[in-house]
Amino acid sequence: MNDRNLFGINVLMLAPCLGKFGGIETFCLTLIEDLIFRGATVRLLRKKVAGFEEDGSIDRNELEIRSAWTSGQRSRFDSEFVKPRDTIIKKAIQECDILHLHNPMIEGVWYAKKWDKICVMTVYNWRRNGWHPRLWAWRWAVAQADRRWYISEFVWDSWERNRRTGSARLPVVSRMPTGEIPPEKRKGFLFIGRWVPNKGIRILLEAYRKISPNPELWPLTLIGDGPLKADVEKIIRQNKIKGVDLPGFVSEADRHRYTKEAKWMVTPPHTNEDLGLTPLEARSVGVPCIATDDGGVPETAGKHALFCKRGCVKSLANRLQEAVDMCEAEYEQKALATKEGLQDYVRPLDEYAKNYLQLLHRI
């Protein structure tokens, strides 16, 4: 890391927040840890957005990650929740060396330009079409950033038909699980994500019910929480579906353990998913994926995944059955092949430090 020394550099991150630990929160903490280890001082402002409802998961995960840091490293990081147009945001931008926005945040770009601050942006969501003033303001904000990193080709294509200078695809990453488990010791299907409409959790339950595999050999583990929790529990109860495990919200360490122990990661959204982080985590430990042809998911699930039509119970059920019927030799080949191309897709975190230093004219 010595060639990416960030000592003395004050980084401000401004990210939208719904109050629950999700993809943006995961990536922010992963990147922040790398920056802290390189000597930077980092402040994270989590901007409350419509629908904000804190459930404690953000604080729990942040505490888990910070617990492994030294006291000196912890002293160079601070985070807090802020309201839109909070004076804290304005003051923090004035004091920083570089502003890293997570998604187009108009006030962040506005103040950065006003005070001639370097402004970089990670764009997580595909561009919506329409004539609403806010949509045009977002386009303006994205165009003004000194660097733009889109999390997938799917997202990038929606914003830039013609690639701009200063833009790149740089997928967000989490702290990837490590250490593979032998294929013969893995069991069942795993879903990780928010239990919200269009993530496919109800379709997955119905598809699993249709094939009714041996619950001992092929359990279905649903990790997460969300507004559909009552619906999920009702579907399981009314249909007497056997083999479904609901651990709820789990720590990062437990999430990694569940990922390694699963035979297949199932990612079935039908919402134009921007990226799909869990397939990357699964592939990093040789766990292949069953995924929909939705948004950026095919990019992260990899060419060796079993793909199904989005929103289609029958198509997903067919893929689940294919996985159940697959012989061990074929599965082992699939597990080995699923890591193919992963290193070409997931770029190292030091890309961010390198860009920060280039913009600050330190290298």
Model-based region annotation:
Residues 6, 13-21, 27-28, 34-79:
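N-terminal strand-loop element at the rim of the active site
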